[in-house]
């Protein structure tokens, strides 16, 4: 039997084996195996199946859906580049080679993922941080407000109302459950009458009384109320006021007992009891848990390393901050035992202890550290008596005689004579201290001071301050010729001793000398070091910057010395002479300016501006003949110079020498016939009332200079003055044909048409001007104002919007736009204007006017100052500033504005030019024009 048994019996069939397939046998199924056919609506055998699985049809649908889910080959799941999104072979068998391929792909993916992992994570981190910055969490947005909750007091917390829940309030809180306490007046009235009332007056129920019997027993006998005493008639009334007084008396008795106690430091001041309690509240802002952690950590540090001074100091300060001062003192005293050689621990102990105890601590510290300067200084600070301080410091100097700090502290307490004696000993003990040598030199006489400084130079040959002090000493005693030698010798000696000459440090020393009044020393230092370490081609630029820096530091003599040295090196540079002249004009005297200008024109005779500055200085001083002689010399050096001709004409006309001015202009027209010369000729005749001569000169000038717009303007204005509207219109039109880009000509023609009532024509002229001159703020501004003056505010606002689109950076337009808005919107408009034109004077002036209109006087004055500082040439800003000070300032403030305006000599501004160029005001000074313009301003903005 065993021999016939096949070896494969009982073994598992190989993979893919089908029984009988080798001999051609195939499996089949008969209907009897399946059973009779069933309808789709027939129930299945499982009668407990859930809905959707109870019929044969449901089972078929489910199996069909499962087959469909195997492979989703719909067009929506197909991509032209990647193919089907799902796996096409997901329904196939998953074999070993598939598993191996998946493992290889997974390894590749992992390898590729690790290649740039750090860079990718860094980028993702930065993106997340950027996202969090742009869109912070609500928690982060309110973090600063949450910090402020620490400032809320307990009373404010208690006063915060409960939020509650308003939903279903009627159902949750029915009216019959509301209890109302009986007022004291009810009991008082009841006791007075001595009667038992078991009902309430209807009027009391009407005004918040009881509609139902009180649950506590008002209709029934009150618990304890019917016993003899409270409800007994005539037993007296319940006085709440006396109960309160008794309670206060009891509190006073207790506080008196405590205050009378002398058994220790528990004596309490009854009046300051609550104040003392408030002062005992810890002032730290940390969390209690954080303090506990810090205390444990510091305790661990102290135990592991008890000889580490910072651990004891930190522990004491932690306890001090938390309000446990005695614990802090105990800790730091323990620290002095463990670290007796630590200065910091002893000083901290002295700081924490009260006065007398601190002195004892310092005395103990001195025994352990007899060479500690800081402890001696602290000991002197603890003494209140000057004699005691001196005694402590002298004792300290016996132990530490080479301490400069101790010598300085001791000298400060002495009288001058004693200080001199002490300093003579100090320089012996500390021969390398420059401060002690200089202090001794200041206290000595002139001869002794020279000896002291010589000794100081021998002991400290590398310090520049000794040399500078020696120079100042010689200057103070009138020996100015030695100052230059000392400074030169100082530079030589310091270089010989290997000291690098630091130019910036020497300039700072010179500025200090200037502020101390040592002018000669300051100038000598500047001359000695100004050229050190500078390339030859950079000298002029660097020196001008140095001069500006000195002026900014208010070291005027230093700046004057720099200019003098620069003029020696560059005697023919007009720009240097000009800078020096402007410096003398702003910070010097008239005499120094004129002396400088005389030297300037001698070196630069072709510089017209220097001649003109000299002539103007003489004219302003009232010396007209000297001004004439300067201009005569200027004519010799600059023949046919237009500027000098016109300056001479102005000089004569301002001094009412009209015939001389006419002759000068006639000569100028023949020798230097320029457009400006003709214009000044017309202007002179016009202001003198000779309109016929002015027109003739104007016609003659236009034959030669027809493209000069000011001549056409003057011709039209003269015609307007004579009320010849047609001729004026013709003059303006002819001028615009020759000068189509002249904005003032367009404005004059438009205003002429508006003046005669031709609003439509004026509007058309401005539209035409804007077409020929695009992006011109002045034309847009006039168009807006034209509509506003006509009462068409909506059209004016629309035009302003278009103007700001075309000229978004025009300060003139933005300043006008602010006041076109209604009052509530003006502040928003001003913010927009400042964003676009932050440094435009017109916008700053508009903001100042806005604050003025809101009666914010301080802010308005600040913005006026900003405006005139940014552009001092804007006359309108000065006029508004002066008007503001007339209404809200003092006499000194008004005079200050007027003085600054006269120094600035403004030439621009709409209101300013309209007044200053008026024929009636042609001889007015700057201050007079300022008053006239301010009078024209109506602060109705």
UniProtKB/Swiss-Prot annotation:
Cellular component GO terms, alphabetical: catalytic step 2 spliceosome; nuclear speck; U2-type precatalytic spliceosome; U4/U6 x U5 tri-snRNP complex
Q: Where is the composition biased (Basic and acidic residues)?
A: 39-65
Residues with the modification Phosphoserine, per the entry, are 143, 279
A Pfam family that the UniProt record links to this protein: TPR_19
Q: Cite the SMART domains for this sequence.
A: HAT, TPR
Q: Which UniProt keywords apply?
A: mRNA processing, mRNA splicing, Nucleus, Phosphoprotein, Repeat, Spliceosome
**Post-translation: what modifications?**
Phosphorylated by PRP4K during spliceosome assembly.
One GO biological process term is: spliceosomal tri-snRNP complex assembly
Q: What is its main location?
A: nucleus
Q: Could you tell me where this protein is found in the cell?
A: Nucleus, Nucleoplasm; Nucleus speckle
Region Disordered: start-end pairs: 1-79
UniProt modified residues of type Phosphothreonine: 180, 266, 275
Presence of keyword Phosphoprotein: yes
- Domain of life, per lineage: Eukaryota
Q: Which InterPro entries match?
A: HAT (IPR003107), PRP1_N (IPR010491), Syf1-like (IPR045075), TPR-like_helical_dom_sf (IPR011990), TPR_rpt (IPR019734)
Biased-composition ranges, Acidic residues, are 66-78
Q: Which residue ranges contain the repeat HAT?
A: 384-416, 418-444, 445-476, 554-586, 588-620, 622-654, 689-721, 723-755, 855-887
Q: Which GO terms describe its molecular function?
A: protein-macromolecule adaptor activity
Complex formation: Identified in the spliceosome B complex. Identified in the spliceosome C complex. Associates with the U5 snRNP particle. Component of the U4/U6-U5 tri-snRNP complex composed of the U4, U6 and U5 snRNAs and at least PRPF3, PRPF4, PRPF6, PRPF8, PRPF31, SNRNP200, TXNL4A, SNRNP40, DDX23, CD2BP2, PPIH, SNU13, EFTUD2, SART1 and USP39, LSm proteins LSm2-8 and Sm proteins. Interacts with ARAF1. Interacts with AR and NR3C1, but not ESR1, independently of the presence of hormones. Interacts with USH1G.
Described by its record, this protein's role is as follows: Involved in pre-mRNA splicing as component of the U4/U6-U5 tri-snRNP complex, one of the building blocks of the spliceosome. Enhances dihydrotestosterone-induced transactivation activity of AR, as well as dexamethasone-induced transactivation activity of NR3C1, but does not affect estrogen-induced transactivation.
Q: What protein does this entry describe?
A: Pre-mRNA-processing factor 6
Species name: Bos taurus (Bovine)
Q: Which gene encodes it?
A: PRPF6
């Amino acid at each position: 039997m065993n021999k016939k048994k096949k070896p494969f019996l009982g073994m598992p069939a190989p993979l893919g084996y089908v029984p009988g397939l080798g001999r051609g046998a195939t499996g089949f199924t008969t209907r009897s195996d399946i059973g009779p056919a069933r309808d789709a609506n027939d129930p299945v055998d499982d009668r407990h199946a859930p809905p959707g699985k109870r019929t044969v049809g449901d089972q078929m649908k489910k199996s069909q859906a499962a087959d469909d889910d195997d492979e989703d080959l719909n067009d929506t799941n197909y991509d032209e580049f990647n193919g089907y999104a799902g796996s096409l072979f997901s329904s196939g068998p998953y074999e070993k080679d598939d598993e191996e391929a998946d493992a290889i792909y997974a390894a590749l993916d992992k390898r590729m993922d690790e290649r740039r992992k750090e860079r990718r994570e860094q980028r993702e981190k930065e993106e997340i941080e950027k996202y969090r910055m742009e869109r912070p969490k609500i928690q982060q947005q309110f973090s600063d407000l949450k910090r402020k909750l620490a400032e809320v007091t307990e009373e404010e917390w208690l006063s915060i109302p409960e939020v509650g829940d308003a939903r279903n309030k009627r159902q949750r809180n029915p009216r019959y459950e509301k209890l109302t306490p009986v007022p004291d007046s009810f009991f008082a009235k009841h006791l007075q009458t001595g009667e038992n009332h078991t009902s309430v007056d209807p009027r009391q129920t009407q005004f918040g009384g009881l509609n139902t019997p009180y649950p506590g027993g008002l209709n029934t006998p009150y618990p304890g109320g019917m016993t003899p005493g409270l409800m007994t008639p005539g037993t007296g009334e319940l006085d709440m006021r006396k109960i309160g007084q008794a309670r206060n008396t009891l509190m006073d008795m207790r506080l008196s007992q405590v205050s009378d106690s002398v058994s220790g430091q528990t004596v309490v001041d009854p009046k300051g009891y609550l104040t003392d309690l408030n002062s005992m509240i810890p002032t730290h802002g940390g969390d209690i848990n954080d303090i506990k952690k810090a205390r444990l950590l510091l305790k661990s540090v102290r135990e592991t390393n008890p000889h580490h001074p910072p651990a004891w100091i930190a522990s004491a300060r932690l306890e001090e901050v938390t309000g446990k001062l005695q614990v802090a003192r105990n800790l730091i005293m323990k620290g002095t035992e463990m670290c007796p050689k630590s200065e910091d621990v002893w000083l901290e102990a002295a700081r924490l202890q009260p006065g007398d105890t601190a002195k004892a601590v310092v005395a103990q510290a001195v025994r352990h550290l007899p060479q500690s300067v800081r402890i001696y200084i602290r000991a002197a600070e603890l003494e209140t008596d000057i004699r005691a301080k001196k005694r402590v410091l002298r004792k300290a100097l016996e132990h530490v005689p080479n301490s400069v700090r101790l010598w300085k502290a001791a000298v400060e307490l002495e009288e001058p004579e004693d200080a001199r004696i002490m300093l003579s000993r100090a320089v012996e003990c500390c021969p390398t201290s420059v401060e002690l040598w200089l202090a001794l030199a200041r206290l000595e006489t002139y001869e002794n001071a020279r000896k002291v400084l010589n000794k100081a130079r021998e002991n400290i040959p590398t310090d520049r301050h000794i040399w500078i002090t020696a120079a100042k000493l010689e200057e103070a005693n009138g020996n100015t010729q030695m100052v230059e030698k000392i400074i030169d010798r100082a530079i030589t000696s310091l270089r010989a001793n290997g000291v690098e000459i630091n130019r910036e440090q020497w300039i700072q020393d010179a500025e200090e000398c200037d502020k101390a009044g040592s002018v000669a020393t300051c100038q000598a230092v500047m001359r000695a070091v100004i050229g050190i370490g500078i390339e030859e081609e950079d000298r002029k630029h660097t020196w001008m910057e140095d001069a500006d820096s000195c002026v900014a530091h208010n070291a005027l003599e230093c700046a004057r010395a720099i200019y003098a040295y620069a003029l020696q090196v560059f005697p023919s540079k007009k720009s240097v002479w000009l800078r020096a002249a402007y410096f003398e004009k702003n910070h010097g005297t008239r005499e120094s300016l004129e002396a400088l200008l005389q030297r300037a024109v001698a070196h630069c005779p072709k510089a017209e501006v220097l001649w003109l500055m000299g002539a103007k200085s003489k004219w302003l001083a009232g010396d007209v003949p000297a001004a004439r002689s300067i201009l005569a010399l200027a004519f010799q050096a600059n023949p046919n110079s237009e500027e000098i001709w016109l300056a001479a004409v102005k000089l004569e006309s301002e001094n009412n020498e009209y015939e001389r001015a006419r002759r000068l202009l006639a000569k100028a027209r023949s020798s230097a016939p320029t457009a400006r010369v003709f214009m000044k000729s017309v202007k002179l005749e016009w202001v003198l009332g000779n309109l016929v001569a002015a027109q003739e000169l104007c016609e003659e000038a236009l034959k030669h200079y027809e493209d000069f717009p000011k001549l056409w303007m003057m011709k039209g204005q003269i015609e307007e003055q004579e009320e010849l509207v047609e001729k004026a219109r013709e003059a303006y039109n002819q001028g615009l044909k020759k000068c189509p880009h002249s904005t003032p000509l367009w404005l004059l023609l438009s205003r002429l048409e508006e003046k005669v009532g031709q609003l439509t024509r004026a509007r058309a002229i401005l539209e035409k001007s804007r077409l020929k001159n695009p992006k011109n703020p002045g034309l847009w501004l006039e168009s807006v104002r034209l509509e506003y003056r006509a009462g068409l505010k909506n059209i004016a606002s629309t035009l302003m919007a278009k103007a700001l689109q075309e000229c978004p950076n025009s300060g003139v337009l933005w300043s006008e736009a602010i006041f076109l808005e209604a009052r509530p919107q003006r502040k928003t408009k001003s913010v927009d204007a400042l964003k676009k034109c932050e440094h435009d004077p017109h916008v700053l002036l508009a903001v100042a006017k806005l604050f003025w209109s809101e009666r914010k006087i301080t802010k308005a004055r600040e913005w006026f100052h900003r405006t005139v500082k940014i552009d001092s040439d804007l006359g309108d800003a000065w006029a508004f500033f002066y008007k503001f000070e007339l209404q809200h300032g003092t006499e000194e403030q008004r005079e200050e504005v007027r003085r600054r305006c006269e120094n600035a000599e403004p030439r621009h501004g709409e209101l300013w030019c309209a007044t200053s160029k008026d024929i009636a005001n042609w001889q007015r000074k700057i201050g007079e024009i300022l008053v006239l313009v301010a009078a024209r301003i109506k602060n109705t903005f």
